[in-house]
Amino acid sequence: MDLATKYFNQINWRYVDHSSGLEPMQSFAFDDTFSESVGKDLSCNVVRTWIHQHTVILGIHDSRLPFLSDGIRFLTDEQGYNAIVRNSGGLGVVLDQGILNISLIFKGQTETTIDEAFTVMYLLISKMFEDEDVSIDTKEIEQSYCPGKFDLSINDKKFAGISQRRVRGGIAVQIYLCIEGSGSERALMMQQFYQRALKGQTTKFHYPDIDPSCMASLETLLNREIKVQDVMFLLLYALKDLGANLNMDPITEDEWTRYEGYYDKMLERNAKINEKLDF
C-alpha cells in the first residue's frame, strides 16, 4: 500500500484551525495533547493549522548557546520578536503572520519510521502545489536556519522545514511554510542572532552558518502574490483530493485537562531557561 492511500484515502482527519488567538507555547501543548488523543484512540488523525505573531522558536541546542542572552536581546530589542524554547527539534525557526504552520498528527510507534512520517507531510505539500510549474525537492539546505534532511526547497532555495515529535503513541509532524514576505530577510535575522549568541566561540555542537540567499518565500519562488489564507484552502482541497474524510470535532473536556498539563510543562521549561539568562 502506498503512503497516500495508507494515510489519507478514506481515513478520518479532524481539522483544527488555530490560525489566530494562540500563543506559540499553547500550540506546542496542543500538539502534544492531540498526539496523546490519537495514540490512545480517543481521536482520529488531526490536521492543525497555526499562525503566530513575531516569535523565534528556539530549539534545545539553542538553549545552550554561550551568549544566548545577547542573542535574545537582539531579537526582542532590535527586531521586535519574542523568543521561546520549544519541545521538538534542535534549532531555531521564525514565526510571523506570513508563515503557515501545519501539524499532521497520527498514530504510530516504532513501526513507523522517522522517514515515513516525514514523507507523509511531503506527499501532502506536493499535492497542495501540484498545479504549480515547479519541482519541490527534499534535501538538507545546509546554510539555512534549522537545516534538516527533509527541508523543502525550489531551485535550492528553502521555503519550509519539517520536524516531528512522538508522544504517547502519537506522532506529530510539524511544518512551517514561508509564504509571504522575504525568506532571506528572516534568514538574515537568524544569522545575526547566532552571531550575537556565539561571538565566534567554538562549541561542541555545530550551529548553522547561515547564508540568507539560500532561503526564500513561496511568494518569491512562485513569482506571484500568494497569501497564507490561500495555502490554507489548498491544504483542505488537497486532503479531499487524497480521499480524506474531514470533520471539525470540538476539543473534549479530557483534552482540555491534558492540554493544561502540557502547557504547564512548556511554561516550566521556558521559566528554567529564563532563570539562566542574565536579564
Swiss-Prot record:
Pfam families per UniProt: LplA-B_cat
Taxonomy, superkingdom: Bacteria
Active site positions, chain numbering: 146 (acyl-thioester intermediate)
Record's keyword annotation contains Acyltransferase: yes
SUPFAM superfamilies (alphabetical): Class II aaRS and biotin synthetases (SSF55681)
GO MF annotation terms: lipoyl(octanoyl) transferase activity
Top-rank EC class of the record's enzyme: transferase
Enzyme nomenclature, EC number: 2.3.1.204
Example of a GO biological process term: protein modification process
Catalytic reaction list: N(6)-octanoyl-L-lysyl-[glycine-cleavage complex H protein] + L-lysyl-[lipoyl-carrier protein] = N(6)-octanoyl-L-lysyl-[lipoyl-carrier protein] + L-lysyl-[glycine-cleavage complex H protein]
InterPro entries: aa-tRNA-synth_II/BPL/LPL, BPL_LPL_catalytic, LipL, Octanoyltrans_LipM/LipL
Keywords: Acyltransferase, Transferase
Functional pathway: Protein modification; protein lipoylation via endogenous pathway; protein N(6)-(lipoyl)lysine from octanoyl-[acyl-carrier-protein]
Residue span(s) of domain BPL/LPL catalytic: 41-247
Site (Lowers pKa of active site Cys): 158
Protein task: Catalyzes the amidotransfer (transamidation) of the octanoyl moiety from octanoyl-GcvH to the lipoyl domain of the E2 subunit of lipoate-dependent enzymes.
Family indicated by similarity: Belongs to the octanoyltransferase LipL family.
Leftover remarks: The reaction proceeds via a thioester-linked acyl-enzyme intermediate.
Record HAMAP family: LipL
Name of the featured protein: Octanoyl-[GcvH]:protein N-octanoyltransferase
Protein's organism: Staphylococcus epidermidis (strain ATCC 35984 / DSM 28319 / BCRC 17069 / CCUG 31568 / BM 3577 / RP62A)
